[in-house]
């Protein structure tokens, strides 16, 4: 990974690792890339509690077939086997990210946790070292985190990363 990061910074092509630590999967178009990502997430059992925190899907953008918003909705449905009910945003077990600093609660932009209970009025989230209740407008400080932007992932570490690079995202693909 370090070797390939150095190559990318130089503008050179990555070298796939035969052992499987680093591999490149080519897609014909955005829909094909989306299908490949979903298949990889199924293969890697992304819905498993432990795997949710070890695996991360990264995309440069929020919009589009391979964007974070569409991927999160699709991964949520894949993991739970159904769409979230009307009036709800999260299922228990969903991987979520805090999107702004909340100094009173000690939760900061980019913190990732797991929903343990959700109602239309409240969302209860377990973080590494605490449990936090979100009520009213605070609920909008959370978003699904099965897929996140490269920007939001900066400073984080993951066991496994699925990184989407598509020509349709060309304006976001600078070294």
Where are these regions (language model features)?
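Conserved flavin/dinucleotide-binding core of flavoenzymes
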Residues: 108
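C-terminal accessory regions
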Residues: 111-175
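Conserved helicase motor core of P-loop NTPases
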Residues: 1-105, 116
């Amino acid at each position: 990974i370090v070797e390939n990061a150095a190559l990318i910074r130089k503008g050179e092509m990555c070298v796939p690792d035969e052992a499987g630590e680093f591999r490149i999967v080519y897609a014909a178009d955005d829909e094909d890339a989306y299908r490949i990502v979903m298949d990889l997430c199924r293969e890697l059992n992304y819905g498993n509690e432990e795997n949710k925190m070890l695996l991360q899907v990264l995309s440069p953008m929020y919009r589009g077939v391979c964007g974070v918003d569409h991927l999160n909705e699709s991964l949520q449905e894949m993991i739970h086997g159904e769409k979230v009910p009307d009036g709800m945003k999260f299922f228990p077990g969903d991987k979520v990210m805090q999107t702004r600093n909340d100094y009173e609660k000690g939760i900061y932009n980019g913190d990732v946790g797991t929903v343990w209970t959700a109602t239309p009025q409240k969302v209860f989230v377990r973080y590494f070292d605490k449990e936090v209740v979100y009520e009213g407008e605070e609920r909008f400080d959370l978003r699904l985190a099965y897929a996140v932007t490269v920007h939001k992932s900066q400073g984080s570490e993951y066991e496994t990363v699925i990184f989407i690079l598509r020509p349709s995202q060309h304006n976001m693909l600078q070294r």
